[in-house]
Amino acid sequence: RTSRRQRQMCIRDRLYVGDYKKGELDVKIFNREWWGLFEQDNISYIRKVTLRLDKLEPDIQYDWQYRVSVDDYKNCIILFTGLDLTEREINYFTDNHIIRNNEDFTFEFGPYHTFLNSELKKTESIGEILRRDYSIYLNYKSNKKLTTQELFLFPCYGEELLISLIWAGDLDNDGKTDFIIQIPTPPNNEMGDSSGLFLSSKADSEELVKLVAYFISTGC
C-alpha cells in the first residue's frame, strides 16, 4: 500500500510492497519463505507468496533501484518471513485505525475484552517545542481480572497523539489478538516512520504479546 520509502531503513522479518533505493534492500532475503497478509472486501487472509524483484531505471531525484511486488499487491498489507503460519482467512478487527490521546480502542475476542489505551507519562520543553511522552498499553479483561502490558513509550511533538493501528486480529491462530501498529523510531521518534508486529503466541509468561518484527523508514 506504500510505494515510496525513505532513505535509511531497518528491516527485520517483514517487508512492504513498494520501491527501494540502492543499499536499502538485501536481495538475499528473497531466498526465504514469505507470507502475505491481505485484506479485501472486509476479509483478511494470509497466504504464501513469491516475491518479485524488478530493477528500476534510476530516478534523477530519488534513485530508486528495486521494486518489490507480489500477486494481488494492491490488497497486500504486509509481508512476513520467519513465522510459522498457515494459509487461511483470519478473524480481524480493524485496519488503519488512528489511536488518539485519552482514547481507548476496544474490541471483543473470545473470552477476552481487549483494548489499547494511552497515558501521558512526561512533558518536556525542548526549546520552543513541547514533547509529550505517552505510554501505550495493551489490556486483556476476563472474568473481572484486568491484565495490562506497556507496549512502548511514544514521544509526541505535536499537540495531539496520533498512532496508526495498521491491523489487529488473530494472525498466529492462538485465539488471542495480534497487532501491527506504529511504533517510535529510534532514538526519540524525531523523524521517519516505524511499525511493529506484536504476536501473542511469542509472548513470555509475564507478557501478553511480544514484538517479533519491525520496519523502520527514516530520512528525507
What residue ranges belong to the model's regions?
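Surface-exposed loop/turn elements that mediate protein-protein interactions on large endomembrane-trafficking
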Residues: 138-152, 199
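Single conserved hydrophobic/aromatic residue that forms the stacking wall/gate
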Residues: 1-11
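Repeat-based blade/solenoid architectures
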Residues: 153-166, 216-219
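Extracellular-facing segments of soluble proteins and assemblies that are Gly/Ser/Thr-biased and enriched
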Residues: 64-143
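Calcium-coordinating acidic loop motifs
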Residues: 3, 170-172
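Acidic/hydrophobic-patterned starts of short beta strands in beta-sheet-rich repeat architectures
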Residues: 173-184
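Beta-propeller blade repeat segments, especially FG-GAP/WD-type strand-to-loop junctions
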Residues: 190-212
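Solvent-exposed N-terminal domain segments of exported/luminal and surface proteins
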Residues: 13-97
